[in-house]
């Protein structure tokens, strides 16, 4: 377990070393850069990449990929694709970039090396405020990520895999929390408390009245607002993580007051958050650069119609100028990210969304959030 809990600053070194090793392997196995297909995905990376105009210039702000951890200690899903093979598929589909998402490590270092390997693509990284950065939200980890060479670490996710809300609400997270309880008390990372000092979720499923953010969360938000990344001089981005609607709204309110430039409301319709349309509308209405994220899980061929309807309603509640579509895939047996986004484009068209609206959610808004030039 100690190996799994290796320091936040050490694991990324392994990741970037693996990236160079993977680059060598990719070169040795030819232009396709694949070895038969994704593990258990049911189709091969060598299959043609999706050809959809909505993907030309698209940026995925939430792309899971290897190298990442998988094992009995943390329980997150194995990954179906590594950063190099994902780049090749995304590039073939005409995509412009993606953010390398991991719950447990910062990915600024991996983004730096991927940019050196493939300078024709926009790679960005981020970090999750989970136990690998400490038992509390850790402002120092944010500074560390921002000062990694290149400055390509941009998104700071509040607690996700280790959040207090998810550990109470979602069954597989509760199992995960039971593992963590062997090492940490409490076995989750909190973002809020009652004004009286008690636990925000002492009476789950109801939060306490008059809750407030923890001091370290407020400090982290201030850092996100005021810190520029090394070399590239970019702004940091707050993503709300897998926290409750009440906690998300508190964080967004505090972030707007602190001057955070861009805010992502992390997948508000997944079980790990579970917002209402009214709460989504309230969240994005707090400022001009707040964006609700809608992941591709509503776009699969076996998704129930009522789920699609729920997502369409959520997107309309946010408004396309305050919404982004992300894949959030990369798990074993899930669609590859470009394929998932192409599915979403089809579902959205079927439900009355125009090409301009698709461009807003897949190209224009992600570029705004990352502070890069708008698509031509």
Model-derived features: where do they sit?
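An N-terminally biased module of ancient metal coordination in phosphate/nucleic-acid-related enzymes
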Residues: 30-121
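Divalent metal-dependent hydrolysis catalytic cores, especially in the metallo-beta-lactamase
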Residues: 84-107, 120-131, 153-163, 236-239, ...
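Mid-to-C-terminal alpha-helical segments outside catalytic/metal-binding sites
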Residues: 338-376
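Catalytic pocket-lining loop regions of alpha/beta-barrel enzymes
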Residues: 234-306, 324
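Short acidic/histidine-rich active-site segments
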Residues: 243, 320-336
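Bacterial N-terminal signal peptides
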Residues: 11-23
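Extended substrate/RNA-proximal surfaces in nucleic-acid metabolism proteins
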Residues: 134-266
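Histidine/acidic-residue-rich catalytic or RNA/ligand-binding cores of hydrolases
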Residues: 69-74, 108-110, 248-254, 274-280, ...
